[in-house]
Amino acid sequence: MFFGTFNHAIDAKGRTSLPVKFRESLAAAGEPRIVLMQYPHWRAVQALPQSVWNELVKKVMDASPLDARTQRSVLKFVSSAHEVDLDANGRVLVPPALREWAGLQKDVVWVGMGRTIHLYDKAAYETQVAEEIPSDQVVDFFGKV
């Protein structure tokens, strides 16, 4: 599981260090690689362990092949994905299309989201978390958990 928020830099080639805690979680689970893809709700990159990606792909591939709206979502979901390995220094190379999608500049933030990880441009992340969540939404959320 992935938890916590970590500030890092991303270089001009698109390399950024995956936080040590996240690398340790991947290693403990026997996950040698991650899959990077567009996060559909905000301009961020979502990182998933290979096993989580495999589960999602199976569900997506079981989606109705005759429903155009579903297939459009499948296309966006699958086509944005990139399997990546960590280098010897624990860095991940974020592909240019994903860097552009998320607006990743020099400073980035890795956010553990339980089974997945999000990668944000630092300014975008700060804007996102600064938005106040209405208390009724918080109550609804925890009432469903």
From Swiss-Prot:
InterPro entries reported for this sequence: MraZ, MraZ_C, MraZ_dom, MraZ_N, MraZ_sf, SpoVT-AbrB_dom, SpoVT-AbrB_sf
GO terms assigned for molecular function: DNA-binding transcription factor activity; transcription cis-regulatory region binding
Compartmental location: Cytoplasm, Nucleoid
Entry GO terms, CC: cytoplasm; nucleoid
Stored Pfam families: MraZ
Claim: S-adenosyl-L-methionine is one of the keywords in the record: no
Keywords of the record: Cytoplasm, DNA-binding, Repeat, Transcription, Transcription regulation
Gene Ontology BP, a term: negative regulation of DNA-templated transcription initiation
Record domain SpoVT-AbrB: where: 5-50, 81-124
Residue spans crossing the bilayer: none
Top-level taxon in the UniProt lineage: Bacteria
HAMAP family with a match to the protein in the record: MraZ
Subunit annotation: Forms oligomers.
Family per similarity comment: Belongs to the MraZ family.
Descriptive protein name: Transcriptional regulator MraZ
Native organism: Anaeromyxobacter sp. (strain Fw109-5)
Gene this protein is translated from: mraZ
